[in-house]
């Protein structure tokens, strides 16, 4: 069959089914097709299709290889196109030995560093990779305070190593509506979770 390589951003809902009536179709995505990828959109929209996935090397593996970070205990998160708070960043880092973040030019290294400093997680270490595999590739590592004013690279992943992770028990996560005053919560759930964790309660 003739293979057509299509740019995923130009696909409409009707183009793929029409093309598959006569052709095989290849969709190219960058990085790991099974992690925050367009593959999930295609699979969910067309569950009956016979799809063969050919994996590539993702940016998390590339970053880990640069700094010798193994991923057995890693937690994976994303600031790219997803809602987050400084508290949610800190809450993830507090609980895990290693936390990976997908970043963007708008939300990335600077926001992670500021969140870690805000929640007194200065004993952590940040590992940053930008433009990995490109000629403009750059990597950095250091304490969070070194990156609080850093510019956010557009193509970037960040890992944070926490030497003293502590799981946060379910009892910590009382909902915000348990702390209402005049119809508004007095504190945020993420703030309460990190404070209790830092107090070792």
Residue locations for each model-derived region?
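Class I S-adenosyl-L-methionine
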Residues: 1-52
